[in-house]
């Protein structure tokens, strides 16, 4: 099985690759700059998401793409448009042209960040993005729906919560995704049979979880193990945010919380 990562040298990709090292015989990395420290079975390709022809070539004979590339925080709309919207289209279109079986799209909780924090939601609610970044993730999920329905591409959208070694604040007692759970989640997203089209919250087994995730967990055969509640004493006295997206909902927010 050949697996390809976009953005594989970033913060999330580096952890995932280390946790899954040696599991797949061929791993291709699309990176912006040369010099990635390669692990077992990995090959580095330098380029970006703007080059559809290059992406199509790199996708040849690939079974699954883990799409982590793009901007990972709020930025101006022109930058989000170029990197996260056009870039994601190029990735899905390259996958279609190259007959890739499955795309795992790194979506985000910021696609639904304007839901109140006192409301538990599932994977069927309408998007309520809290930022241009969140809009780009809602777009990617919808684009994946089109590529699944129209061309049969299997798509797993992972609405990643707060990817950290440990929670940073009271909000993350609800949204935390541990490194261990992230690795097992992506492993199941790659290996689970016949997933069709799925939206799965990338969140650990947190007592204060805001997201009903049973359908996605069942579809992938995934079981998160960690619980942010073990860190709760560190944030005693902190008040949860009004909205699930936290600081991203601020009209003046331009990035920096990721």
Segments the model singles out, each with a brief description of its role:
Residues 159-166, 176-198, 205:
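Alpha-helical substrate-binding/gating segment
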Residues 82, 116-155:
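Catalytic helix-loop patch of NAD(P)-dependent Rossmann-fold dehydrogenases
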Residues 128, 153-173:
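Flexible, glycine-rich beta-alpha linker
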Residues 50, 79-90, 98, 109, ...:
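Glycine-rich NAD(P)-binding loop of the Rossmann-fold in SDR/ketoreductase-type enzymes
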Residues 198-199, 205-223, 238-258:
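Conserved C-terminal active-site "lid" loop/helix of NAD(P)H-dependent oxidoreductases
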Residues 90-128:
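Conserved Rossmann-fold NAD(P)-dependent oxidoreductase catalytic core, especially the SDR/UDP-sugar
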Residues 36, 43-83:
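NAD(P)H-binding glycine-rich loop region in Rossmannoid oxidoreductase-like domains
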Residues 1-24:
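N-terminal Rossmann NAD(P)H-binding glycine-rich loop of SDR-like oxidoreductase domains
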